[in-house]
Amino acid sequence: MMNKFSLFSSSIYLSLLSSFTWAETSTEVLQTIQLQAETEGENLQQSTAMTKFSHDILDVPFSRSVLSKTLIQQQDVQRIDDALTQVSGVYSQTNYGGGFWDNFSFRGFSTDPNIGAQIIRNGLSVNRGLSAPRDMVNIESLDFLKGPMAALYGRGEAGGLLNINTKKPEWERSSEVNLRANSLEKYRASFEHTAPISDAVAYRIAVAHEDNQSFRDHVQSERWFFSPQLTWKISDSTQLDFDSEFTRQDGTFDRGVSSYQKQFVMDPKTFTGEPDDGNHIQKDHFYQLRLAHQFNDDWKMNNALSVKDTQLKGFSSEPRRIQSDGRTLERQRRYRDNKSDDILFQTEVLGTIQQDWARHEVLLSTELGQMKYRQLQLRRNHSGSMPNSIDIYAPIYGQYLPELPLFINTEEQQRYFALNLQDQIFLNDQWSVLYGARFDHITQDFQNKLAGTSSKKDLQQTSPRLGLNYRLNDRWSWYANYGESFALNSGMDRNGDVFNPEKGKSYEIGGKYQITPQSLLSLALFKMDKENVLTTDPADSNYQITAGEVSSKGLELDLETQLNDQFSIRANYSYTDAQVEKDQILAKGSRLSNVPKHSGSISSNYEWTLANADRVGLGAMAIYVGKRSGHSTDNGFNLPEYTLLNLNAYYAPTDQLRYQFNVHNLLDETYYVASYSDMWIQPGDPLNASVSLQWKF
């Protein structure tokens, strides 16, 4: 640890020296083509990803929340999970073994917990199958799109989805080094460089490495990330872009702590897995080629080819139940080797049609792709003949490493084609109407190699979306929207048939008030329903059927305001009532897990310039998350409410150099982020501090 701190301190010293000796250099900046699928990063007043056309937020009949690059830096966001408390209506779900993918719900509805949340990238669908957690070195901003987006982006939840705006190659040469050290022995270093190769070609390279310990015993991870990008301006009207990302993450598979009789009895530090199981290894490779052509001032075309493959494998010993003595935890040992491969081709044509009575903004797009998903799992439960248990108060490791029989061996293939049409009609300066629909045709093949069964189903789904927007004046707008969604269910029922997909409906009304050019207050009321949710088969509890129905309704209030050049405030509040409407086992009114009825946050930042032109900033953030169900069956086990206080400060002696200090969980509150059951509970980090350095040159 001392060597790492020495390296960090030396880097800070070198950067201080360089700030007095390095001169700025510049090169000619070329104008690049503005692509709808490749925005420079969403901001408070402009939106592209919600309709594919760039608009003032007051002209769009939907709601969203944006986390800019500045906010991401101020709040020391290291993972998408860290950003969720700053967004209304978005809640943490279990992130699979301590952080092997991003997972969260929108307005109470979440996707398959064995795959993670659906995410789009620069307005393009890319996240089908497994995905490693996104690295922040490539992220310009996070755009949380609320409400029905299936008509634009295909299958997903009715509550919304996340659009990640990534950084791009630039024609002005620049480099950036970021170093970070945390009191929990978490270390990170990243390097970014972009420059022109010629007047027509520019590149960008990003590299990041993490070496993370944990406040939890025997839990650690190491992560490598590499991303080369290339942009070629073929002509004044045509541009070709290539993006790639390579991620490897090695780490402990950690299910967290367990409860006994619905009570929190364990020390949050205690690890009940098996260190001798070794690390889980995750590899994620992503490639994307985009071609954009501008026909004229009114019409353009975007094309994209995306290829993605991800693998996760390793051994783990996971909690199963605590015996009647209240201290002996029975474990289940597993080996998993899961892999997904996805290829997707997309084409979209966007244009404007001006008529005497209205202006039309028209989108026509198609998608063609294939995704393969393989699950291989070996597992064995604790038994008298082959024990595998541990004392939760005095764990002794290395006693049991039982041999494992094959338990799951499945392969799923999805071939899909989609056609999408949308038209937003601006009748005048006040009224606009948006209508659109997407038709999906999916062939789903599922093979259970262990049982020797297979099933195939062709699915057709039409997802409409309607929106009405009324802009009263330059400050006020009101809107309403309706949309439908669907999401595939993986697996087979007891008859060997592939499940029908989940189907959802969403209704929303809301208003927006632009207090100042840099301040926005927004209110949204919503109601959603979903059917064909998987539930236990009453004829055989070893299987499931699509007989469940759930609903969610609520209110979201967001404020983003820049009071002056120095002082900014960001606040949000959510009320979400998400519950079961129909189920074979659960009672009507049972709560959906990890969804608090009440939550909110408020943050403020104050910045000023000293007499010598040095810049200083101070900030604070308070987070509240209410009580929520901690079990997927809502069996009476609850995660308690919690309040966190975070602080941040920075000092920038030059435009090229910035030092930052962050304190997380200042009051050192014991809290729990999310859980899958009363056996798998993810505790939050205790009081910790981080120091970071940013050096641009």
Regions found by a protein language model. Give the residues of each.
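Acidic, small-polar-rich N-terminal luminal/periplasmic segments of exported/outer-membrane proteins
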Residues: V29-E172, I509
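Outer-membrane beta-barrel translocator/receptor signature
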Residues: R128, V137-E140, A151-P228, I234-T238, ...
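Acidic/polar loop-and-plug regions of large Gram-negative outer-membrane beta-barrel proteins
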Residues: E210, S214, F226-Q294, V307-S340, ...
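Structural signature of Gram-negative outer-membrane beta-barrels, strongest in the C-terminal barrel
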Residues: K233-S235, S340, R359-M371, T410-K530, ...
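Face-selective signature of the C-terminal outer-membrane beta-barrel domain
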Residues: Y287-T310, R331-Q447, R471
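Membrane-embedded beta-barrel scaffold of Gram-negative outer-membrane proteins
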Residues: R290-S306, T310-S316, R471, S477-W478, ...
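Conserved C-terminal beta-signal and adjacent last beta-strands/turns
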Residues: N338, S593-F697
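Gram-negative outer-membrane beta-barrel transporters
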Residues: Q430, K527, T546-S632, L667, ...
